[in-house]
C-alpha cells in the first residue's frame, strides 16, 4: 500500500481507470465507497432501555464512469457480456489516484473493485443545437472494494 502525504491533500483530477487490465480515460468517476449495515435489536425483558447494534452485511455502491463518446465499443461489449451470460465471475477494475507528475509507477491510492459487472450504459444527450461533448456513461456493480 502506498503512503499518502500528510502535508496536503491530492487533487481529484489526476486519475486513471483500468478494467481487466485495459486502461481507459474517463472524465468522472463516482460512487467509490463501502458501508456496513447495522441492525438494531432489543429483547423484551432487557433491563436497560437501549438497543444493541449488531453489524450486518457489507454493501458497496455502484460505480459510475463518464467520458466523452470515443467511438469505441469496449463499454458496450462489457454490458453485452453480462446480457448474454458471458461475464463469468466478473472483471476487475482499478481506480488509481495519481500524484502531480502522473507517474505510472506509483499511484498515491488505488481502489480495486472485485467481480465487476456492467449494469447500465447510456449515450447522449444529443442535441443538434448543443455545443457540448457527446457523453457516454457506464454503471458497474461490484462485490468488494479493496484499498491497495
Could you say what each language-model-derived stretch is?
Residues 1-148:
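Glycine-rich, low-complexity intrinsically disordered segments
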Amino acid at each position: 500500500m502506498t503512503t499518502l502525504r500528510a502535508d496536503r491533500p491530492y487533487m481529484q483530477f489526476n486519475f486513471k481507470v483500468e478494467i481487466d487490465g485495459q486502461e481507459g480515460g474517463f472524465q468522472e468517476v463516482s460512487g467509490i465507497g463501502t458501508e456496513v449495515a447495522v441492525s438494531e435489536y432489543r429483547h423484551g425483558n432487557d433491563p436497560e432501555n437501549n438497543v444493541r447494534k449488531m453489524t450486518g452485511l457489507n454493501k458497496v455502491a455502484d460505480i459510475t464512469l463518464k467520458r466523452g463518446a470515443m467511438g469505441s465499443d469496449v463499454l458496450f461489449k462489457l454490458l453485452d457480456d453480462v446480457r448474454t451470460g458471458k461475464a463469468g465471475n466478473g472483471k476487475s477494475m482499478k481506480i488509481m489516484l495519481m500524484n502531480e507528475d502522473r507517474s505510472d509507477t506509483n499511484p498515491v491510492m488505488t481502489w480495486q473493485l472485485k467481480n465487476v459487472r456492467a449494469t447500465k450504459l447510456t449515450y447522449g444527450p444529443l442535441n443538434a443545437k448543443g455545443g457540448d461533448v457527446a457523453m457516454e456513461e457506464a454503471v458497474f456493480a461490484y462485490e468488494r472494494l479493496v484499498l491497495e
